[in-house]
C-alpha cells in the first residue's frame, strides 16, 4: 500500500513523503491515527498544495513540544515500592505509571504511548527513561525506584557526588 505522510512518523519519514508500507501497517496504524492518507492521484495533488501549510503547523507543534520538553528534562520521578531483600519489586513500574506521575509534575497530559520503556522496571535504582512527545523530539527523565524515603535520599546524595567527581576541576594558574 502506498501512503502519503501528513505527520512525521518515527523511523518512516517526514510530512509529504510517499512511502510503500505493509497493508496492515497502513490500515491498522497509519490511517486510523491520521498519520497518513492513501497515495491516490487526487491526494498527491492535494498534498503538494498543502505541504507548506502542514509543515508550518508541524513547526508550531514542535515549538510547543520543545517548551514542554524543557520542563520534562529536569524532572525526577520518585516511586516508593515494596521490595524483596535483594531489591526486586513486588510488581513493577510501567510506562502508564510514569506517564501519570509525569503529567501531574508538569501539568500537561502525557500519554503512556509517549514513554519509551523497553521493559518494565522490576528492581530498585535510578533509571533514565525516554519521553517522546513528537516524532523528531525526545528527552529523558530520571526515574528513581526505592523501598523507602531514606533510600531515595541516599540515591540523590550518590548522584550528586557522582556529578561533582565527573565535572572537570578548574585549573589554577
Curated annotation (Swiss-Prot):
PROSITE patterns: RIBOSOMAL_L9. The keyword Ribonucleoprotein applies. Keywords: Ribonucleoprotein, Ribosomal protein, RNA-binding, rRNA-binding. InterPro entries: Ribosomal_bL9, Ribosomal_bL9/RNase_H1_N, Ribosomal_bL9_bac/chp, Ribosomal_bL9_C, Ribosomal_bL9_C_sf, Ribosomal_bL9_N, Ribosomal_bL9_N_sf. GO terms for biological process: translation. GO terms for cellular component: ribonucleoprotein complex; ribosome. Pfam families: Ribosomal_L9_C, Ribosomal_L9_N. The keyword Coiled coil does not apply. One of its GO terms (molecular function) is structural constituent of ribosome. NCBIfam families: L9 (TIGR00158). PANTHER family: 50S RIBOSOMAL PROTEIN L9. Binds to the 23S rRNA. Belongs to the bacterial ribosomal protein bL9 family. This is Large ribosomal subunit protein bL9. It comes from Rickettsia bellii (strain OSU 85-389). The lineage of its organism: Bacteria, Pseudomonadati, Pseudomonadota, Alphaproteobacteria, Rickettsiales.
Amino acid at each position: 500500500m502506498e501512503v502519503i505522510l501528513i505527520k512525521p512518523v518515527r523511523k518512516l519519514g517526514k510530512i509529504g513523503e510517499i512511502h510503500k508500507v505493509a497493508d496492515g501497517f497502513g490500515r491498522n496504524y497509519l490511517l486510523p491515527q491520521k498519520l497518513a492518507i492513501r497515495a491516490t492521484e487526487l491526494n498527491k495533488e492535494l498534498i503538494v498544495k498543502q505541504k507548506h501549510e502542514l509543515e508550518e503547523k508541524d513547526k508550531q507543534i514542535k515549538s510547543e513540544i520543545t517548551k514542554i520538553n524543557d520542563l520534562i528534562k529536569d524532572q525526577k520521578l520518585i516511586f516508593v515500592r515494596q521490595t524483596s531483600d535483594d531489591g526486586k519489586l513486588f510488581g513493577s513500574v510501567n510506562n502508564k505509571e510514569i506517564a501519570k506521575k509525569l503529567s501531574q509534575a508538569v501539568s500537561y497530559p502525557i500519554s503512556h504511548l509517549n514513554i519509551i520503556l523497553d521493559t518494565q522496571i522490576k528492581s530498585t535504582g535510578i533509571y533514565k527513561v525516554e519521553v517522546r512527545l513528537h516524532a523528531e523530539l525526545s528527552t529523558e527523565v530520571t526515574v528513581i525506584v526505592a523501598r523507602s524515603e531514606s533510600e531515595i535520599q541516599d540515591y540523590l546524595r550518590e548522584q550528586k557526588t557522582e556529578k561533582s567527581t565527573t565535572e572537570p576541576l578548574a585549573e589554577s594558574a
